[in-house]
Curated annotation (Swiss-Prot):
ATP binds at residues 495-503, 517. Residues 25-406 are extracellular. This is Probable receptor-like protein kinase At5g24010. The lineage of its organism: Eukaryota, Viridiplantae, Streptophyta, Embryophyta, Tracheophyta. Keywords: ATP-binding, Glycoprotein, Kinase, Membrane, Nucleotide-binding, Serine/threonine-protein kinase, Signal, Transferase, Transmembrane, Transmembrane helix.
Length: 824
């Protein structure tokens, strides 16, 4: 029986890992451990001995005589001895190992940069190949990194090569591990390929090259190579939980009941299966049925990953009490999981389930567990014990790593082919209906048409008919012109990379500078985003919304062309780049501009548009630092007049996501307000919305900033670059506005119009102080929209902004377009 962790159990919980160290460790058939650049052997974490590669027998593995061994002359006292030396490859080099047992092997490469007399390892830039297959491209690091790869070796020799990226570069490594994996560590049977609306079988998994990205001990403490059977490291899940209130830790002191055919101690150590996160059913703020969700940044967009989930029912007092569902990226991956049946009716018996899933357009993988329809209402629960995420690298034709992914693509192609056929059929019907109703529709309201969402794939004909039938002919730009204007999409002109594809700096025939966003060639996965941006941006113009110049759909391409924003994203002027930091006044003006653009989206039609992905990288700056909201791929129409929300799947970016929208899947314009509030704190503190490398209390920017705000000490975490120039009255009002935006419930958040008015007041306070307003009163400002009774509610006004921007707005929104000249 497992118990939720409370204060009296905390010590026992954290010492739990120490109770299970006596089991016999796995003994691999092939086992090579190299201490690179050292003259002596050394141990690391355990009794495993790493051989020096500067003397026999370790030096026999080096296949080059042009490498250099270096030592850290000033090592940190906390640094392991293994990381005090390194092998440097100025012109490339490799290690070669004899493989006695063919099959799956682990390869771990340790990189711990330091500065020596001749080399600063932090400036290294190189590639790593395994038997000629590139596993690391253009690698450099300023901190300790351990890269782990799992792959099948069929040759008698394993060669690991380190190649400088350019002539001026060099490669290095501090330690190398090569050892054979336990039998059946990667299985070819039973792996589910999670795709929209179904879960197919992914074949030939053992022949793929895997790179470990995350290894999580859910609900437990950190595990090191000292207490793991395969010398792995498992980190805690606290920083990955999307809603901490939904989960509570559970644990047991009883050893897992391992069964034949289930998990083994080599798959995961005891401590993983003895702890878990389960639903916090005592939390009264949550609904009766909810999911526990984790979000994992994997960096690579639209890339397949092996997701291995570990389960052990340590929360049930008897069999057949626990039923739950598993979701990956919102798709149902496993319905009605019954651990009792899967473990042959043995309680607390470990097992794991493998899935293959694709990361989303933001480079995220989201995993959720939640109650099943089979759950007893009195025992609704779900749990998860561990997570491993491994990136599946590009298909390999090398003899060393055999196997192909043809089966996968056959499955995917079959499914998507069905979607293509259905899409063509429904589009044909749609076109006929449009011809019939064209006159009627042209006389209707000028509000935006609802955005269409497509699933699966489509070919160029489908796209052409969809876009062409929308009447956007004047926006078409030929592929030849874009190819010429970007020097054949030269990689040196890339100014950004997103989930849709790369963004290039380019120019048109008339020498107009543009930003060219090109969807991944041959892929139709971005079709909904492609259509959404054209639908929205072709119908509106506003000074603070990025303008669409045109699009291209020739040769199965999906290319969007925008006005060029010289200064790039707001984020690059706050942190993480060499750009000079913006002043406090500039930051306020940027926030005000973005709020104006967002307010126009929310109020520019009867339904309005909800952006759904407001963040600092989607607010761009032109040459004069004028802010413009960009990237409308996730946007959709707001609720109808008689509705309060739009029910839809959760979309957005980790760290900016409205918690209420996440819990209820009910989208409103207040979801954008929450995201904008996070941006306000980002502007003030100059740090990311989520930073998993920080201590737990600081990981989430909004939570951390609000905590300091409520203590009256927000000035202590303000960006040092602007701390001396912010007036206290300006900071106070700005912080109050940001805090209200980030309220847990949408009803407690202001409208974006209120936010806009308050930000303009913040700027006035910064430039002139509170003037005649008593200090205790300047925290609340009345929005002038409350004094609109003199305007007719039924009329529409077409506004000309003098700078070429225009749009249809109702008279009830006219005040949102007024410019406040004071303080400009």
């Amino acid at each position: 029986m497992a118990f939720p962790i409370n204060l009296t159990q905390t010590l026992l919980f954290f010492f739990c890992p120490l109770l299970h160290l006596s089991f016999a460790a796995f003994t691999p058939t092939d086992n090579y451990l190299i201490n690179s650049g050292s003259n002596t052997n050394t141990s690391f974490f355990t009794t495993r001995s790493f051989l020096s590669d500067s003397s026999e027998p370790g030096s026999s593995f080096l296949s080059t005589d042009r490498s250099i061994s270096i030592s850290d002359t000033n090592p940190s006292p906390d640094s392991p001895v293994l990381y005090n030396t390194a092998r440097v490859f100025p012109v490339g080099g490799s290690y070669k190992f004899q493989v006695t047992t063919k099959g799956t092997h682990f390869i771990r490469l340790h990189f711990a940069p330091f500065k020596a007399s001749r080399f600063n390892l932090r400036s290294a830039k190189f590639r790593v190949l395994i038997n000629g297959f590139s596993v690391i491209n253009s690698f450099s690091t300023s901190s300790v990194v351990v890269k782990e790869f799992i792959l099948k070796i069929d040759d008698p020799v394993l060669e690991i090569s380190f190649l400088p990226f350019k002539a001026s570069g060099f490669g290095f490594v501090n330690a190398v591990e090569v050892f054979s994996a336990p039998k059946d560590y990667i299985m070819d049977q039973g792996t589910k390929l999670v795709i929209p609306n179904s879960a197919q079988i992914f074949s030939n998994l053992s022949s793929q090259v895997l790179e470990t990205v995350h290894r999580i001990n859910v609900g437990g403490s950190k595990l090191t190579p000292f207490n793991d059977t395969l010398w792995r490291t498992w980190v805690v899940d606290d920083n990955y939980l999307l809603l901490r209130a939904a989960a509570r830790r559970a644990w047991t002191t009883h050893s897992p009941n391992y069964q034949n055919g289930g998990a083994t101690r080599e798959i995961a150590p005891d401590n993983v299966y003895m702890t878990a996160q389960e639903m916090d059913r005592d939390n009264q703020e949550l609904q009766a049925r909810f999911n526990i969700s984790w979000g994992f940044q994997v960096d690579e967009k639209r890339v397949l990953h092996l997701v291995r989930l570990h389960f052990c029912d340590i929360v049930s007092s008897s069999l057949n009490q626990l039923y739950f569902n598993v979701f990956i990226n919102e798709y149902l991956a496993f319905k009605d999981v019954d651990l009792s049946t899967l473990t042959f009716h043995v309680l607390a018996s470990p097992l794991y389930i493998d899935f293959v899933a694709e990361s989303d357009r933001s480079g995220m993988l989201r995993i959720s567990v939640g109650p099943s329809d089979l759950s007893n209402p009195a025992r609704v629960n779900a749990l998860l014990n561990g997570v491993e995420i491994m990136r599946i690298l590009s298909p390999v034709s090398s003899e060393v790593v055999s196997g192909k992914r043809n089966v996968v693509w056959i499955v995917v192609g079959s499914v998507l082919g069905g979607f293509v056929f259905l899409s063509l059929f429904f589009l044909s019907v749609l076109c006929l209906c449009r011809r019939k109703n064209n006159k009627t529709r042209s006389s209707e309201s000028t509000g935006w048409t609802p955005l269409r969402r497509f699933r699966g794939s489509s070919n160029s004909r489908t796209t052409e008919r969809t876009v062409s039938s929308s009447g956007y002919h004047t926006l078409r730009i030929s592929f030849a012109e874009l190819q010429s204007g970007t020097n054949n999409f030269d990689r040196s002109l890339v100014i950004g990379v997103g989930g849709f594809g790369m963004v290039f700096r380019g120019s048109l025939k008339d020498n107009t500078k543009v930003a060219v966003k090109r969807g991944s060639p041959g892929s139709r996965q971005g079709l909904p985003e492609f259509l959404s941006e054209i639908t929205i941006l072709s119908k509106i113009r506003h000074r603070h919304l990025v303008s669409l110049v045109g699009y291209c759909e020739e040769q199965s391409e999906m290319i969007l062309v925008y006005e060029y924003m010289d200064k790039g994203p707001l984020k690059s002027h706050l942190y993480g780049s060499t750009n000079p930091p913006l002043s406090w006044k500039q930051r306020l003006e940027v926030c005000i501009g973005a709020a104006r653009g967002l307010h126009y989206l929310h109020t520019g039609s009867s339904q309005g548009i909800i952006h759904r992905d407001i963040k600092s990288t989607n607010i761009l700056l032109d040459n004069n630092y004028v802010a413009k909201v960009a990237d409308f791929g996730l946007s959709r129409s707001g609720p109808c007049i008689d509705e309060t929300h739009v029910s839809t799947g959760v979309k957005g970016s980790f760290g900016y996501l409205d918690p209420e929208y996440f819990r209820r899947q009910q989208l409103t314009d207040k979801s954008d307000v929450y995201s904008f509030g996070v941006v306000l704190f980002e502007v003030l503190c100059a740090r990311p919305a989520v930073d998993p490398l920080l201590v737990r209390e600081q990981v989430n920017l909004a939570e951390w900033a609000i905590e300091w705000q409520r203590k009256g000490m927000l000035d202590q975490i303000v960006d040092p670059n602007i701390a001396d120039e912010i007036k206290p009255c300006s900071l106070k009002k700005f912080a109050e506005t940001a805090e209200k935006c980030c309220a847990d419930y949408g009803v407690d958040r202001p409208t974006i119009g209120d936010v806009l008015w308050n930000l303009e007041h913040v700027l006035q306070l910064q430039e002139s102080g509170p003037l005649n307003i008593p200090e205790e009163d300047y925290g609340d400002v009345t929005d002038p929209r409350t004094a609109r009774q003199g305007l007719s509610n039924g009329s529409n006004i077409e506004r000309d902004y003098g700078d070429g921007t225009s749009g249809i707005i109702s008279s009830t929104q006219v005040f949102s377009q007024l410019m406040t000249n004071a303080g400009r």
